[in-house]
Amino acid sequence: MNITKHPLVSIIVPTLNEETTIPELAASLGRLRGDFEVIVCDGGSADATVEMARQCGLRVIEAPRGRGPQMNAGARLAIGETLLFLHADTRLPENALEFIAGALADERACGGNFSLIFGGDTREARALTRIYPFLRLGGMLYGDSAIFARRDVFDRLGGYREYPIFEDCDLYQRMRRMGRFVRLNACATASSRRFEGRFIRTFALWSLMQVLYWLGVNPNLLNRLYKPLR
């Protein structure tokens, strides 16, 4: 893994009970080309996530639970010029850092994200891979897509708002006001695990939450509605 003392990109990974994904995550990060650092931000895992990450040579910090607080904690310690927020079950292409550098060569660009395909030979994965391009065209954005941002832009925005859900959509909306948000054609590979065995119900529920969010319903209220139903 080409982790250096002066990385161009800081890869920030929020985790909670991800012991089964850590070895594959570490292996995929080891295939990246370029200078980077990795900060795993754990929100109090009850399994062996922290131990597994350290065994794989990853730097781990502890942070208040919640993706927003965890990613903000990682960003505060990051030293890269670019911040890349990566879910533990999302896999980047080997030349991901080259795509990011190309996007940010445009001085108007404030950051961006990757397109997505969903891994696994399942009906859920195939359906999500077909659906996602239309969601992206409609302005829907999720953290699975490996959002990246210039460090100075992220700092000026005050980082992630510490919402329990839709913290990624909120950051995207605010970043767009700061400059050009680059939607890369290059694909990251996300997991369809939360949809497996209950695709229609989960997709319908999440779509409803998305519509309510775009209508202006507060994410804290949406989370209270969402938690008992998921």
Where are these regions (language model features)?
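Acidic helix N-cap motif at the loop->helix transition within catalytic regions
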Residues: 20-24, 45-56, 95
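A conserved acidic beta->alpha catalytic loop
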Residues: 28, 42-50, 90
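Acidic donor-binding/catalytic loop of UDP-sugar-dependent glycosyltransferases
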Residues: 48, 88-102, 173
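Short aromatic/hydrophobic "clamp" motif used to bind/position activated sugar donors
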Residues: 83
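Conserved donor NDP-sugar-binding/catalytic core segment of glycosyltransferases
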Residues: 95-123
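Hydrophobic helical membrane-anchoring modules
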Residues: 1-4, 173-230
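Glycine-rich, basic loop-to-helix element that forms the pyrophosphate-binding segment
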Residues: 62-78
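Short, acidic, metal-binding catalytic loop of nucleotide-sugar glycosyltransferases
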Residues: 27-36
